[in-house]
Amino acid sequence: MIRAYEQNPQHFIEDLEKVRVEQLTGHGSSVLEELVQLVKDKNIDISIKYDPRKDSEVFANRVITDDIELLKKILAYFLPEDAILKGGHYDNQLQNGIKRVKEFLESSPNTQWELRAFMAVMHFSLTADRIDDDILKVIVDSMNHHGDARSKLREELAELTAELKIYSVIQAEINKHLSSSGTINIHDKSINLMDKNLYGYTDEEIFKASAEYKILEKMPQTTIQVDGSEKKIVSIKDFLGSENKRTGALGNLKNSYSYNKDNNELSHFATTCSDKSRPLNDLVSQKTTQLSDITSRFNSAIEALNRFIQKYDSVMQRLLDDTR
């Protein structure tokens, strides 16, 4: 006989270790191996932890998913047998329950589980037509919705921030020539915007995986002569004149701009570039605020799930205590 995990998880694990997988109800389940692999792939840790409020005997904390055979026994313990009559009511109910288990494991951001909470959630998922299952579904759906929105915002914000970074590199180069009252060539003697060092990268492979590089590789290129050989660069003019970016193309570009105190075209050029990037800066601020808000909502959904599981565990524990 295997003692209940709700009353003493240490005794439950000890009893499981004494039996073979073949002796457990779900040993022949068609999804047993799949669920074992899913738990491994999601790096889910299931542990038993001594809780003085619940456990009468002290025991050592233990991560039980380190033992694959034990993990298989835990899953086989709560899994029911496959239905004999395929397509019947029981089979449909069972398949829906297993589907909920998979969806929960795949979508839950929580990878650290105490045994009692994990087993409770698994039982929730396998049992149909219960209000606690509906509550869990609402919470998980909320987490998925906000998680997807957060991922999309992060990607968009990374692209916007990268384009703004390229503008800041260009602005710094213009300011350098302004301070020396000089002339900036933005064409064949331009800085190469493909230079990783301009953005603080030291490793070429890391730079090539960056959001800045993904924008720059869509730009046209200028061929220049370096020590008698040809080299392709992305010049300032290439970048500003391209439509392949969020801010679009800047028209009527010259190859160079000079400082002149009477008609300072270099200063005008600096202002034009600044005006071009200003809406982008405003958009970055807006998206950053949105990301902060959606992250807060995502974290609230996780907190709600944890509170629900803790509350359920507390209620179940009181019910179990009353039956002793």
Swiss-Prot record:
InterPro entries: LowCa_resp_V_Ag, Vir_assoc_V_ag_sf. The keyword Secreted applies. Pfam families: LcrV. Disulfide bonds: none annotated. It is found in: Secreted. One of its GO terms (cellular component) is extracellular region. This is Virulence-associated V antigen. The lineage of its organism: Bacteria, Pseudomonadati, Pseudomonadota, Gammaproteobacteria, Enterobacterales.
